[in-house]
Regions:
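Extracytoplasmic
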Residues: 81-84, 107, 162
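Short, surface-exposed glycine/acidic/tryptophan-bearing loops
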Residues: 100-122, 184-189
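Alpha-helical segment that forms one wall of the substrate-binding/catalytic cleft
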Residues: 114-178
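A hydrophobic membrane-anchoring alpha-helix module
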Residues: 209-229
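Catalytic and substrate-binding regions of cell-wall glycan-acting enzymes that process beta-1,4-linked
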Residues: 161-216
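Export/targeting segments at the very N-terminus of extracytoplasmic proteins
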Residues: 41-96, 135-139, 146-156
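N-terminal export signals and maturation junctions of secreted/periplasmic proteins
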Residues: 3-73, 115, 122-123
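Structural recognition of the beta-strand scaffold that forms the well-ordered cores
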Residues: 87-91, 109-113, 167
């Protein structure tokens, strides 16, 4: 289930586009829909390479087993995010399969939609011709994750974890930040996410705690690691 991502990247943008929302319960054959309402938050990607510890998350070894693994790690470091986080997002989004889907424009290992790809790719000097390249996908996903981590961290006042940032990746930065700061695990997830989106993801009736535990279990040990150093 996807319950739900060389050289220094320096991006400045007025709004972070909402990201894809998975609706298919099986990894490797994801289907995605867009949130019913857009959520935007200003953000700036990291301007220095990632300096924290990494390489021990469950998904990392699987990422490194891919032909593009080392380049994906370099992309994450250049964007200032934890390579373990990029690996965990790739695992939960597609199980590292460079695939599209039949119901939306989401594509690639990190299942980025066309609109999001076009904005970030342009700012990274990439083009539509790079859309199917997992290395280019890693650069775009890393920039997106960096922006989302910044948005969540502004709300929590602390470095965001993989689980917290994935909430923004899945539901948009506003809902993701609210979920990350919710201290009561019994709070209904519907307080922050529309009933339509929850139903599409088979999450109707879920609590915040249930959602976070499910994401963490599917993301692996990288779920609890800080996304930025």
């Amino acid at each position: 289930m996807a319950v739900a991502t060389a050289g220094t990247v320096s991006l400045a943008r007025g709004a972070v586009p909402e990201q894809i929302v998975p609706v298919n319960p099986e990894p490797g054959s994801p289907v995605f829909t867009r949130p019913s309402t857009a959520t935007t938050t200003g953000g700036t990607a990291a301007t220095s390479s990632y300096q924290g510890a990494w390489g021990t998350a469950d998904a990392f070894a699987t990422l490194m087993a891919q032909t593009y693994g080392a380049d994906a790690v370099a992309a994450a470091q250049a964007a200032g995010i934890n390579p373990d986080t990029l690996a965990a997002f790739g695992q939960i989004e597609s199980h590292f399969q460079n695939v599209g889907n039949t119901s939306s424009s989401a594509q690639g290992v990190w299942q980025v939609t066309d609109g999001t790809w076009n904005q970030y790719a342009s700012e990274l000097g990439l083009s539509a011709a790079d859309r199917s390249d997992p290395v280019a996908q890693a650069k775009v996903a890393s920039a997106i994750i960096s922006d989302y981590a910044s948005a969540v961290s502004r709300s929590t006042g602390a470095p965001a974890t993989g689980t917290q940032v994935y909430g923004a990746y899945m539901f948009g930065t506003k809902a993701g930040a609210a979920i990350a700061t919710e201290s009561n695990a019994s709070t209904p997830l519907s307080q922050y996410v529309s009933a339509k989106t929850l139903a599409a993801n088979n999450m109707s009736g879920w609590t915040v705690g249930q959602y976070q535990q499910t994401v963490a279990s599917r993301m692996g040990s990288g779920a609890s690691e800080a996304v930025t150093s």
